[in-house]
Amino acid sequence: MNNKILFLIVCLNAFFIEAQTSMEAKKLLENVSKQIESYDNIKFEFNYVLNNRKEQINQESKGEITVAGDLYKLDFLEATQLYDGKSLHTIIPENEEITITTPEEGADFGINPTALLHFYKEGYDYQWDITQRIEGKKIQFIKLIPTEEDAEILSILIGIDVSRKHIFRIIEVGINGTYTTLTINDMKVNTPLLEDYFVFDKKKYPDYYIND
């Protein structure tokens, strides 16, 4: 009887500890989201790595993002995306082509920078993961596990700079063994921007084909 009671106590303790760490993980993510939303704008460079050892794939790219509310400018994979709140303009200099879409239609192009603030709020369970010191920063990782059985990813690790409450790194692990890593570098906040910074100016691209 004593062994059964002890086993039950251990199980209950494990349950409550897991629930507590899950709440702590969610609270930290919410604090990060509030911190970033408090800025007029954010601008940062990033490194993007796609790796799959089985398929012998290792791709590295760099990019830059400026976000102000729902507006953003994204330079990534030799293309520029401008979202002015209504239309998404994808500018590809190599092809001298510009595609105009709605955000929903253009969502498959790559990443939506504004989604970094909110994507974790639905569809995931939370776990308090490892703490690492990277580049002199204390980085606390939060593990997100999809609640849907048919999800295409196993987990997402979000590394948070504890002192600044900024996202430092996001690691997505796919069910096919693909690791996608986004590392944020050189973040600047409340940078003075021109009023038309996110506005597409057709005059700058006189010879481009516009597909709308």
Tell what function each PLM region has.
Residues K62-G110, T180-T181:
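An acidic-aromatic
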Residues M1-N2:
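N-terminal secretory signal peptides that target proteins for export/translocation
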Residues F16-I57, D70-L71, K204, Y209-D212:
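N-terminal leader/targeting segments and the immediate start of mature chains
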Residues P103-E135:
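Flexible, surface-exposed loop/linker segments and immediately adjacent secondary-structure boundaries
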Residues I5-A14:
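Sec-dependent N-terminal signal peptides
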Residues N47-R53, D75, I91, I145-T147, ...:
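A generic structural motif
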